[in-house]
């Protein structure tokens, strides 16, 4: 399991998780429990909202007394670049192969975690890795960009919210996050332009997902008739159009 933008997720294994607080951070704990209950062997990829390893999480729903943290080289920086995160994720998957004999994985990525997973898949394929990705499932992943990033980078006016209070709150809060990370931070590099431009992330990925079944899931809790499709409907941060990659060619999937 791979968490998304600005998240903290400690490394956990099927029989090893955090003892105090949430088992695996506030982003993926519930889904981890559901997948384990269904009989899956579940590992959470370590992720930190900054460089370095992670031994516990802070903020809402903290986790502590977690399994021994893995090195920074295996830990995704959820405020950094997609490709750096993908490289560290691929290193983590290689570790699972070396340490536990895992040859095949199903990746589940939440939000930006889906982009980290896509980048890791390309890295594994390009290096002829011994690890095979059997499937990819993305949950509200901004395949073609996210409208708060478009607002933060000056490409979308706040009037696109159509005076919807939660939308205005999301955009203003997101812009503060993007400003704190800087123009190369994760919050800015998942804009429509950065992902969909001629030399953007999607173009560079080419056919990396060829032969891999992909399941895309998005949310539509917030909607406004007549609103801009990249924004409405959405689950609050990622529009359904982007989460379902409706404007991407089939070859990209």
Where are these regions (language model features)?
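N-terminal non-catalytic accessory region
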Residues: 1-108, 112-157
């Amino acid at each position: 399991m791979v968490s998304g933008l600005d998240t903290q997720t400690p490394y956990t294994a099927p029989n090893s998780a955090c003892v105090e607080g949430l088992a695996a951070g506030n982003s993926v704990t519930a889904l981890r429990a559901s997948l384990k209950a269904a009989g899956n062997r579940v590992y959470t990829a370590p992720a930190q909202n900054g460089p370095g390893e992670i031994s516990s999480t802070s903020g809402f729903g903290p986790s502590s007394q977690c399994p021994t943290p893995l090195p920074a080289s295996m830990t995704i920086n959820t405020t950094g670049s997609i490709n750096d995160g993908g490289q560290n994720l691929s290193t983590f998957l290689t570790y699972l192969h070396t340490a536990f004999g895992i040859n095949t994985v199903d990746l589940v990525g939440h939000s930006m975690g889906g982009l980290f997973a896509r980048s890791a898949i390309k890295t594994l394929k390009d290096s002829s890795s011994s690890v095979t990705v059997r499937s990819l499932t993305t949950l509200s992943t901004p395949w073609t960009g996210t409208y708060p990033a478009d607002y933060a980078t000056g490409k979308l006016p706040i009037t696109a919210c159509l005076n919807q209070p939660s939308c205005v709150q999301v955009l203003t809060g997101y812009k503060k996050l993007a400003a704190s990370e800087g123009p190369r931070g994760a919050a800015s590099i998942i804009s429509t332009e950065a992902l969909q431009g001629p030399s953007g992330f999607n173009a560079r990925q080419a056919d990396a997902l060829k032969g891999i079944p992909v399941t895309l899931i998005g949310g539509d809790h917030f909607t406004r008739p007549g609103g801009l499709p990249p924004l409405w409907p959405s689950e609050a941060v990622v529009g359904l159009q982007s989460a379902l990659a409706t404007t991407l060619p089939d070859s990209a999937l």
